[in-house]
């Protein structure tokens, strides 16, 4: 779908795009193809798409994969997509009555994606997330999907450049923080490419980037320690320039923290931004959940 087609559809239907919903639609065909290539799709793949908009990426996903679940919050766009795919389904049936329409592989859901993910007890481990995520909810959606063995096997997400850089960051990087660690606990960053702002309509104020994340083959932590990891990370970065040990004293006894820091060869003066993911994992394993001053 080209830019002039997008404009024509929106004008014809009287749809004014809403900034609060992060509605910036990717129209550049070269960038769309790069996203599809990065997803490494096969006809057996199941794909979750969040925020399909007018459906340019959806069309390519249906060509390459076996099943697509597209979740759209804006009812005006859902109405357009249903009409569009119903018309294509009828046209396809007329041309090839014995060949299944690709539309039959599409499930279009009118819902708030973040609410859906929070309440949907689905195992996503056989799915891939391939989406141009709305800026306003991209980070919480990724954290919600980082759920251990139920997490998607691959994420190919187009995001605001700043968010993408956080996902790819390493310790001692300005972009390194809570989002980095909560997502990288389950996913290994593979690659990133920049998508200029003028590839979207309307053009956002900043560039975007597409990141590729693969789910880790082996979990870094057992499920029963995930909540403790989250607590440690959030507490450690609550004041990122402050010494970690002082912050963690709010949750664990000082004597235990000093002993664990010494065992792991972490300086008592160290700040959270200096610790690697592996060090946070080791810290989580070494601190006794039973000695917590408050509940997880």
Task: Pin down the residues of each PLM region.
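Catalytic cores of RNA-modifying enzymes
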Residues: 1-234, 262, 273, 277, ...
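Short helix-coil junctions and helix-kink-helix linkers
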Residues: 249-250
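Short, well-ordered alpha-helical segments
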Residues: 256
């Amino acid at each position: 779908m080209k830019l002039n087609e997008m404009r024509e559809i929106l004008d014809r239907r009287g749809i004014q795009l809403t900034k609060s919903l992060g509605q910036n639609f990717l129209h550049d065909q070269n960038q769309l193809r790069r996203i599809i290539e990065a997803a490494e799709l096969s006809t057996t793949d199941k794909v979750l798409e969040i925020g399909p908009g007018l459906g340019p990426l959806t069309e390519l996903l249906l060509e390459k994969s076996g099943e697509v679940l597209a979740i759209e919050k804006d009812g005006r766009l859902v109405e357009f997509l249903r009409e569009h795919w119903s018309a294509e389904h009828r046209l396809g049936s007329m041309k090839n009555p014995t060949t299944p329409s690709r539309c039959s592989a599409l499930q279009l859901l009118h819902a708030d994606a973040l609410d859906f993910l929070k309440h949907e007890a689905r195992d996503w481990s056989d799915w891939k997330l391939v989406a141009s995520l709305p800026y306003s909810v991209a980070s919480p959606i990724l954290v919600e999907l980082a759920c251990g063995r139920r997490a998607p096997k691959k994420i190919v997400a187009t995001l605001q450049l700043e968010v993408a850089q956080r996902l790819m960051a390493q310790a001692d990087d300005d972009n390194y923080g809570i989002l980095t660690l909560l997502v990288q606990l389950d996913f290994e960053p593979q690659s990133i490419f920049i998508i200029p702002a003028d590839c979207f309509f309307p053009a956002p104020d900043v560039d975007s980037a597409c990141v590729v994340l693969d789910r880790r083959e082996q979990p870094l932590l057992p499920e029963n320690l995930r909540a403790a990891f989250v607590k440690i990370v959030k507490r450690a970065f609550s004041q990122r320039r402050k010494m970690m040990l002082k912050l963690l004293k709010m949750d664990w006894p000082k004597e235990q923290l000093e002993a664990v820091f010494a065992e792991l060869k972490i300086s008592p003066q160290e700040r959270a931004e200096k610790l690697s993911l592996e060090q946070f994992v080791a810290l989580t394993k070494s601190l006794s959940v039973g000695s917590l001053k408050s509940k997880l």
